[in-house]
């Protein structure tokens, strides 16, 4: 009797095991079949995906901000894993990760988390530039070369909208600065009241080449010089998403100040984090050392839980010196900011508020101006580059600059925008206008 029971148990185990392996084999075969027309093998795609999420979960210093902004990271991770087999080529790989990183930020801009932008390639060589480590990386540049070819092919075949829709993206290319009209479109000027109030709207601080940068500087200097006899200069950054920080420093502040200005801010970081160590070793141009007492440093109540993710505080000081010869302007400067203002434009707003270079009017910016240098990661199989800030910039009140932005000196008056509020403020200061 016992022998029969043992035989039955063994038979059941054998049949069960065989059934399991048959089902597992069938499932694995079906799973592999999904990747038959994919850009890379299942293993390679999943390795790249895991690499990205390792950074998001263990290195990205703004993860908590994304969660507070409403992003469900676990759901996003599961949802996008299912989409991996749909990636067909370099263009779709690029758009897949652009879409993923946007969703992680709940469609906001938090700490410059993104793919390395194809529009940032060197316009002469079509190679990656300004990354320190990957500018001459053969695999990275090969990926971006093929990406450009795929983009051109999609445009020629009128497939751009279809592919963008597939990855839930709506992209607008940057203004073409390579033509004179393109450069002019970055500036809008008008005289609001002759010899009293001049207005300058700067839509970007981004330039692609040294040649364009020099043309940009020359044009901006010409505009500011033409306004030097005015009592009030209004600089509008409400549509400015940033670019090259040296442009606002060299082209606006230096020509207009009479004595050097000192700008100070702090960043938090985790000195033991593997990604931070890579950043310090390969991407940070100056030695990063904790020079503040971390434990006594107070985070704002709004982002206090984030403090446990860090162990160090570093204070930065930037000194901007007057340009000689300077622009002979002695009037008041007003800086308009809004929710779109970010990155280098946010840094300019923070500088203006701290140093009193300008009276800052509007609403909180989107931030991202106080996080220092960019950090780049190369995906192990595709060689796509992703980027992020690794240092956590802090406002003077201990709040996170990438979450709360820079607050203005004067908020918009009820029912009025920043320009209208600025003009009202000028009136109250005694300016005689006809508005």
Segment roles from a protein language model:
Residues 246-417:
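Conserved acidic, small-residue-rich alpha-beta core segments centered on
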Residues 4-9, 13-269, 274, 278-285, ...:
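Flexible, low-complexity junctional segments that flank or bridge functional domains
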